[in-house]
Amino acid sequence: MKHAFKSALLAGALALALPLGASAADVSLLNVSYDPTRELYVDFNKAFAAHWKAKTGDTVTIKQSHGGAGKQARAVIDGLQADVVTLALAYDIDEIHAKAKLIPRDWQARLPNNSSPYTSTIVLLVRKGNPKKIKDWDDLAKPGVSVITPNPKTSGGARWNYLAAWGYELKRNGGDQKKAQEFVRKIYANVPVLDSGARGSTTTFVERGIGDVFISWENEAFLSINELGADKFEIVVPSVSILAEPPVTLVDKVADKRKTRTVAQAYLEYLYSDEGQDIAGKHYYRPTNPKYVEKYAQQFPKVNLFKIDELFGGWQKAQKEHFADGGTFDQIYSKK
């Protein structure tokens, strides 16, 4: 798995995985996903294909497409024939409804937990020994600290990163938005390069050796340590972070056109199964089934988490205020 992860780091951002299953497959699916779910879905796809074969006798081939969540959503809107999408945040799937009408408006109500079979959060990955003594978000705003994070215009994970830092400062200063914006501006003044997706930023930090601290998906941080060496990196858990809820959905019009609705729906539902939840936990995603929450409880650090609705009023409002053209990110980054 270590070799596979290193190879994935060097791969292109939008790559189709080799099909799973025999060449004479009865049905194929395309799962369009965000950047760091590659290893998760390699294992999950194998498990689902075996489950489906045992249940129906049919062979299912699952192909994967990965990249920054915003770019992935736009690819589906522009015609990429995804049977299902498993993206980093709800806004990008809302856009598939709003701009292409490929899914219903109420897509998020169709599966449990607002269609999020697993959750995650944002942590800080530093080099072994933590030479810059990073302890919390405020250390990222100090002069002389090089911070790696992707571009929130294209990456879903980067938007979670941005809001996690903003939310930390809001909680610290009693809700002053101007102080929060200035705090986040200082962090982005320390960012030397904005990659288009989370895996690209992992490559920048882990493989290229750029930066003192990487604002990272929790699962990506664990993967970097466990696959590339606990002697090279360590995780710093901030005092406050955001509960990230990556959602999934059937792409109705594509699935109906390709006559894959039944298997595509079963594929998503299997993410909530015992096997699906166990695979999520093994890949450092936080399961939502209480049985597997308990099983993997010792794996995950205790984090003081807030929800996007709590501080930002949900994704539609957050996107408009922070990441749309002229929003706070543009204001911050134009001053760099």
Language-model segments: which ranges?
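Extracellular/periplasmic juxtamembrane helices and adjacent flexible linkers that interface
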Residues: A255-K336
